[in-house]
């Protein structure tokens, strides 16, 4: 009887483990000179993405433009504003995982003029996210949780409005940012 119980328990655990969701934390983030926090070595959104990946056990995927943005803030925003005005789709570097193989996706980006940075649109137009669950998180300095409606339209996914954290909090008050992440990610 004990052997049968052990076998059944093993089978149940195996089924339970097989049913776990594969989680991806995909984000765009920019270091260098940033609004409000100056020159930084790690972008605000990257800091939050790492917290979420650690909390969920998810795989990190950094979306990177093939051509880096200028390091200076003013030069960067000039390029980014032009991309937005042209609805550009800048080339991105190849990624090391297939995002289509994941069940649940956390998507993070800094809010630039009420939108995701344009390399994120390139990413989402390249990969099929239809039917997936996307949980959004953003860093900002006053725009709040922006870009979600357009993300729904571009992906066809079940996009949830999620977490908005000030960039200066992500950068300079990491304990506070971690508490916000912990409260949001269940």
Model-assigned labels for residue ranges:
Residues 1-4:
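Positively charged n-region of N-terminal signal peptides that target proteins for export
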Residues 9-17:
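Hydrophobic h-region of N-terminal signal peptides that target proteins for export
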Residues 19-102, 179-186:
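N-terminal beta1-alpha1-beta2 submodule of the flavodoxin-like/Rossmannoid cofactor-binding fold
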Residues 33-39, 107-110, 135-141, 167-171:
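Second-shell loop/turn segments in exported
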Residues 38-42, 113, 117, 141-144, ...:
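Solvent-exposed, acidic/flexible segments
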Residues 57-59, 158-161:
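Conserved beta-strand segments of alpha/beta enzyme cores
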Residues 70-158:
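Helix-loop-strand module that forms the ligand-binding subsite of alpha/beta enzymes
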Residues 160-186:
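Glycine-rich phosphate/pyrophosphate-binding loop and the adjoining helix
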């Amino acid at each position: 009887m004990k052997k049968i119980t052990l076998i059944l328990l093993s089978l149940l655990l195996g089924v339970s483990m097989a049913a776990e969701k594969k989680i991806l934390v995909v984000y765009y983030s920019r270091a260098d000179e940033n609004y409000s926090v100056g020159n930084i070595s790690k972008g605000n959104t990257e800091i939050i993405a790492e917290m979420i990946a650690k909390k969920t056990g998810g795989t990190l995927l950094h979306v990177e433009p093939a051509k880096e943005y200028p390091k200076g803030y003013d030069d960067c925003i000039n390029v980014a504003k032009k991309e937005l005005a042209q609805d550009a789709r800048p080339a991105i570097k190849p990624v090391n995982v297939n995002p289509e193989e994941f069940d649940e996706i956390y998507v993070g980006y800094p809010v630039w003029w009420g939108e995701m940075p344009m390399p994120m649109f390139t990413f989402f137009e390249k990969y099929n996210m239809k039917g997936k669950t996307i949980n959004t998180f953003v860093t900002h300095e006053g725009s709040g949780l922006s870009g979600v409606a357009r993300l729904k339209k571009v992906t066809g996914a079940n996009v949830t409005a999620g977490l908005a954290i000030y960039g200066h909090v992500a950068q300079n008050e990491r304990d506070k940012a971690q508490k916000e992440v912990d409260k949001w990610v269940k």
